[in-house]
Design a protein with these regions (language model features):
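Conserved C-terminal portion of the radical SAM core fold
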Residues: 1-52, 56-77, 81, 99, ...
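Glycine-rich, charged/polar anion/phosphate-binding loops
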Residues: 72-80, 86-89, 170-172
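A short catalytic or substrate-binding loop motif that flags glycine-/basic-rich loops and adjacent residues
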Residues: 82-85, 177-179
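Radical SAM enzyme core and accessory elements
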Residues: 90-206
């Protein structure tokens, strides 16, 4: 299970911390939370006000502030396969209501190359982090309860992996072709793969 709350300014932006703590409390049934800022495409009738949109840096700041230190801003990194302005992700182990980060900023790793597409890499991440692993028997489990013990830690990575992610959709007022070219989320239509934001792009009444 991945929780996927849509965030709307003046509606639930102050509930980010509560949503995160609830998701952690439900681990390992809940494998992560995806914060989705409301998009202004599709059937949106008009252009949003200037402060309606939620930015990624604002969302990262609020996640750190409202989590009371459970998550730090530097633990939420740009996607290594999409454009860095399109989203972020954090990879953690959940243990006793706390999150232990598995990622750190490193300019030499996690760079998308030509060996596989961005979509392939994202599918591999989902398979690795969001699918439930096989259940070990009692004799195979480490019961020490110490996250610093290697066997216990490796068990927890498999069974209590937890992700925090977000994706910022584009609309008619924010469309950026450099972001669109690196899209990994597509709609298949009439034999073509069309970037998600472009497929649902709608004009606004002036």
């Amino acid at each position: 299970v991945i929780l996927d709350p849509t965030l709307v300014r003046d509606i639930n932006m102050e509930n980010i911390g509560d949503l995160l703590r609830y998701a952690i409390s439900q681990s390992p049934k809940v494998r992560g939370i995806h914060f989705q800022p409301a998009g202004y495409f599709g059937r949106i009738p008009g252009k949003p006000a200037g402060n309606d949109r939620i930015t990624l840096d604002e969302l990262i700041y609020e996640t750190e502030r409202q989590s009371d230190g459970i998550v730090k801003a530097e633990e939420l990194l740009p996607s290594c396969c999409d454009h860095p302005l399109c989203g972020f992700h954090g990879d953690f182990v959940a243990d006793n209501g706390r999150l232990f980060p598995l990622l750190k900023q490193d300019n030499k790793v996690n760079i998308c190359g030509s060996d596989s597409s961005a979509a392939d890499k994202n599918r591999a991440f989902v398979a690795k982090r969001w699918l439930r692993p096989y259940k070990k028997t009692g004799s195979q489990q480490c019961g020490c309860g110490d996250i610093h013990n290697m066997d216990y830690f490796l068990d927890k990575v498999s069974t209590h992996g937890f992700t925090i992610t977000s994706m910022l959709f584009q609309d008619a007022g924010t469309m950026d072709f450099s972001r669109l070219r690196r899209c990994s989320l597509h709609v298949y239509d009439n034999g073509k793969l069309i970037p998600f934001c472009a497929y649902y792009l709608s004009a606004w009444e002036q």
